[in-house]
Swiss-Prot record:
Keywords: Cell cycle, Cell division, Cell shape, Cell wall biogenesis/degradation, Cytoplasm, Peptidoglycan synthesis, Pyruvate, Transferase. HAMAP family: MurA. UDP-N-acetyl-alpha-D-glucosamine binds at residues 94, 123-127, 306, 328. InterPro entries: Enolpyruvate_Tfrase_dom, Enolpyruvate_Tfrase_sf, MurA_subfamily, RNA3'P_cycl/enolpyr_Trfase_a/b, UDP_GlcNAc_COvinyl_MurA. Belongs to the EPSP synthase family. MurA subfamily. Its EC number is 2.5.1.7. The active site is at 118 (proton donor). Its main location: cytoplasm. GO terms for biological process: cell division; cell wall organization; peptidoglycan biosynthetic process; regulation of cell shape; UDP-N-acetylgalactosamine biosynthetic process. The keyword Cell cycle applies. GO terms for cellular component: cytoplasm. Pfam families: EPSP_synthase. This is UDP-N-acetylglucosamine 1-carboxyvinyltransferase 1.
Amino acid sequence: MNKFIIKGGETLNGEVDISCAKNSVLPIIAATILCGEKCTIKNCPMLLDVFVISDLLKSIGAQVDIDLNSGDMKIDTSNVKSIEPDAELVRKMRGSFLIMGPMISRYGRFKISLPGGCNIGTRPIDLHLKGLKALGVNIEIGHGYVEANAAKLLGDRIYLDFPSVGATENIIMASVFAEGETIIENAAQEPEIDDLINFLNKMGSDIKKIETGAIIIRGVKELKGIKYTPIYDRIEAGTFIIAAAITKSKIKINGVEEKSIKPMIAKFCEMGINMEIDGKSLIIDGRNELKPVDIKTMPYPGFPTDMQAQIMSLLCCTEGTSVITETIFENRFMHVPELKRFGANIKIDGRSAVIVGVKELTGCSARATDLRAGAALILAGLVAEGETQISDIYHVDRGYVSIEKKLTKLGAKIERVE
């Protein structure tokens, strides 16, 4: 089993290139099912989850070719024959559920195993299914599978009880061929949703977002294959911002969408991190003394839950008391016991974590319990005195492209060993 070994205390310097967003790439790959033609997704991040969803498409008959050097993924869904993707692949990743919308839209039916992914809460699929049912889909759940069929999809007004990203994406994709007009109210507003809409519209869909944030989809007859480059990964960018701040370093981050990272920038500036935006780049100066902050994770445009663990690592080293309240997932503090191994002072109170900054962290052996927890442990290891070993790093590989190589280029001492 691979692990990371980090020797802390190094100052970072130089530039790092951000990859395209995994959370954009996965629904876009799923959406290629809709057109039944050849699509090319450019600059795909070579991540475990990307390989899983590409294998998932292969399991239903799609042809997928990946250029490992350029990251270009060529997908031909013209010969998809099965409506039941490989169950073992589905169980590897929760994002597998993103093929429900495209499958019901193009084929009128699907059978899919209940999915896997990070164990950070129940993350129910009821909102996905509620949206599909509103469009006229019949759904049965039993023996670990979800089976669905629809003789005809009809547009409807759908109100989401919570602005779920996955549910919003599935309903959008399920609606592109539905007769009439579908309106999704209280839809998720994440930049990755906008990217999916842009991709679908370039294929020939008729989707728009109005001032209220509602998404309107007017059904079309067909879509065409296209070439497309997804947006940059705002969560990876945020992780490297913290890498600079936690090591008291100055670095340049290339591949930043200013609008998408504004919610994070607000908190980073409140802490005292200096940031200068230069086009698609961000210059980070983390050499100031930082101040504690209180954070509440919220749907976009609030502070992202996917950055909660990473900023906790930074607050562990920031003098004073900070409070993080997690409102999205009910089980997303699994990194706390691992951070305590470094000497962090954290107490959990319900959905809140109270962090009292300590003067220094000490290297230790820790385990990545999920994707973002793994990133948080790497960040702690960068500043900890001595050597840190992090196991179960396959979680990290689900969301970060060669993070150890990018950090090494900046001057960190981190290596992957078996």
